[in-house]
Amino acid sequence: MPYSQEERLIALTTPLGEDVLLLAGFSGHEGISRLFSFNLDLLSEKGPVNFSDIIGKNVTISVTQYDQTPRYLNGMVSHFGQSGSDSRFTRYQMQVVPWLWMLTRYADCKIFHNKTVSDIVRQVFDNRGFQDYKFQLNGSYNPMEYCVQYRETDFNFVSRLMEQNGIFYFFQHEEGKHTMVIADSSSAHEACPGQKTAGYNLASGGIDDSDVINSWSIEQELRSGKYTLTDYNFKTPSANLTASEPSVIHVGGNNKFEIFDFPGDYTSRGDGGVVAKLRMQEEEAAHMVANGSSVCRAFTTGYKFDLEDHYQASMNASYVLTEIQHVASVGDGYSLEHGGSGDTYSNHFTCIPLTVPFRPARLTPKPFVQGPQTAIVIGKSDYSDTSGDDGAGDSEEIWVDKFGRVVVRFPWDRAGACSCRVRVSQDWAGQGWGAITIPRVGQEVLVSFLEGDPDRPIITGRVYNADKTVPYDLPDFQTRSTFKTRSTSGGGADNYNELRFEDKIGSEQIFLRGEKDFDTRLKNDVREWIGNNRSLIVTQDQMEKAGGDLHSQVTGNVNEKVGQNLSIQVGQNLYEKSGMNFAHEAGQVIHLKAGMTVVLEAGTELTLKVGGNFIDINPAGISIVGTMVMINSGGAAGSGCGSSPTSPKDPDQADDGSKGGKMN
């Protein structure tokens, strides 16, 4: 006659069929915010089991309670093995875990934008095809501007997010299914199904004749009495973000103990108060725990029960089960075809008072970025989520916000989600002064992470690559240093500004090039010293204006050539003095005119000459020679061209350096 689990305390249902695998015993543990795991000892008289038919499948353990109703433990098979056989049975071992465990088999690098913790958890679960979960959240959670899953399993990622936010989870079991309950308050702790109360029975000695607790111990630990956090927000750099939360537990003078930590992972003092309270509750949750053993088959983590009949009346209160170790076995090990009288079940459990809010310990480490990474700056058209973004730029070549932040894409971001706006380290940063160069779209930048936190990137440098090459071929121009820009938008290789230094011995040079205008404004003196020649070429007009005097000294010659007119206006006196000769020659007219007096004075000789006629005055006398000399005999004086010098143009004003600068 085939063996059956029908009359047994424990049984297993699998996709292989009824009683193909007989449950001889199991042990395991479950805990709030922990993956449950049950190790099963199995027997089969049906022949070899194909492992692929059972691994990854859903199975259900049933434990018959004292009222003959079943209590279920449902899960997925993560491990299956065969250990041996005898004349009747082949022995197998099985490990049963929640569907959440499957997320330990996925690891990824992924970026989330403007999502709450519940949004992210839901997205991770749904993307992996898991739907058996529900939220019971009372708290309000702000969207996170930027959240990174970095080289970690999906399970670790959602675990640390929930731990960070004080969110816990446990499982509801039913036949063929288990549901993950995600909660953040004591209201989520319902009474154990079929076990609202549990009596304490010291005399039972572990005899499982009723649902009783047969051992109970309670312990209290001295914990810190205050939690203080602080952080820094570059958008409000002067704000004091320190937040503190005192403990509601007062024991052993714990008020003098304080935990101070940085960073608190918040951006405002109000949010800091919420985080400090969560951290304090996390500290308080473990201050008092009770440990016990029982035969209460309905005990399930995440649920509550009322302790009764304890000899110390203060112990009789409501408790939340936080951890349970289960052990059950078939007494005769199926040595008999029928039975069950020797079957046993017991557990060891840990619980906390219902009055103390449960907060999960932050046990899941956040990934630590070991060093800087490189990334590519992207433009607005490449950005997957621009909601609420205040970035602006002239074109797709530059995309920056008012803080000088740009958006980058990391090489590990296979989804192409891109980063948040990332601050850029500059050489100097003051109040409205300093240095700034904005990384442009397509450039490769060096990204560091504050305290190694993948959620806190900062650009600390820029690097060339095979697509974005150096301005001058190397090593040919290895002695050349330059600061060379590119005109935007649509600028080409010939559109740039540049400040260049050549340090090759004998060829040293400072080169300055502007694509359009060059403005210089000095509030005091300018002094120049040139050791050799100076050349100046102006292809159009040159205007100069001096508010005071203009002094010029030339040791050698002054040679000037004017292609058209030369106009000079003097408001008062015009003085010219030549050490030797002074010669003026005009192709047509020289006109001298004075409002009062014209004096021509010569030391030895003065000559007026027109053609063959002249008047010559010298120390020997005055000679007048002409074809005809007429004195008071009619005729008329010649006329000159007059003097109408053109007024000089005022030079353009240099850019005054005001905010915004010269943009045309």
Language model features: what each stretch is:
Residues 171, 181-186, 190, 369-601, ...:
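Structural signature for extended repeat/solenoid scaffolds and their inter-repeat hinge/linker regions
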Residues 313-374, 460-466, 470, 475, ...:
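Acidic, low-complexity/disordered segments
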